[in-house]
């Protein structure tokens, strides 16, 4: 399976239950993936390991609220960027308290199509490799038909212990 082959919404929902951020989160109030955010406050995207995919392949469902959209019903670009951010980080983050967390160093996004609010999407992230404390990852946002509507690449740096 290629990295841009999406999982089903049901698989993303199942993966989300394995989100390591529920056990340990360096930024629990993160706008995108913070488990201490209430429904309607932040994006609440919880990317967890996908069964049957290589380690570091995560997925989560996302249904953007209408408050995240403009008058045209389309989710604002900065919010789409945010939806793709944390799924790249959780390709490498663990619940192990002895492992220092990672922080985002570089991020590039391409939005391929409008992202209407109040629809179901699957967000996926996967590892592209490591170089010392550097971790490269990618992510994509898929619509209900499995079409890629946005994609990103990211460089994460692990903090020193």
Name each model feature, range by range.
Residues 1-32, 115-117, 126-161:
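HotDog/MaoC-like acyl-thioester-processing domains
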Residues 1-74:
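Non-catalytic linker/capping segments at the edges of enzyme domains
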Residues 61-63, 108-110, 124-126, 140, ...:
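Residue-level recognition of well-ordered beta-strand positions that form the cores
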Residues 64-66, 86, 113, 158-160:
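Non-catalytic surface loops within mature trypsin-like serine protease
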Residues 74-83:
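Short, conserved micro-motifs enriched in small and acidic residues
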Residues 81, 87-123, 135:
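Hydrophobic beta-strand-centered segment that forms part of the acyl-chain substrate-binding groove
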């Amino acid at each position: 399976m290629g990295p841009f082959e999406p999982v089903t919404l049901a698989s993303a929902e199942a993966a989300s239950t394995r989100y390591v951020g529920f056990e340990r989160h360096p930024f629990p109030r993160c706008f995108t993936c913070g488990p201490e955010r209430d429904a309607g406050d932040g994006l609440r995207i919880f990317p967890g390991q996908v069964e049957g995919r290589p380690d570091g392949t995560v997925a989560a469902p996302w249904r953007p609220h209408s408050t995240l959209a403009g008058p045209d019903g389309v989710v604002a670009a900065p919010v789409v960027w945010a939806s793709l951010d944390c799924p790249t980080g959780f390709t490498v983050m663990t619940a192990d308290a002895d492992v220092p967390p990672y922080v985002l160093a570089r991020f590039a996004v391409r939005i391929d199509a409008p992202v209407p609010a109040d629809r179901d999407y699957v967000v996926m992230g996967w590892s592209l490799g490591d170089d010392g404390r550097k971790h490269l990852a990618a992510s994509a946002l898929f619509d209900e038909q499995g079409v890629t509507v946005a994609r990103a690449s990211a460089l994460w740096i692990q903090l020193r212990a």
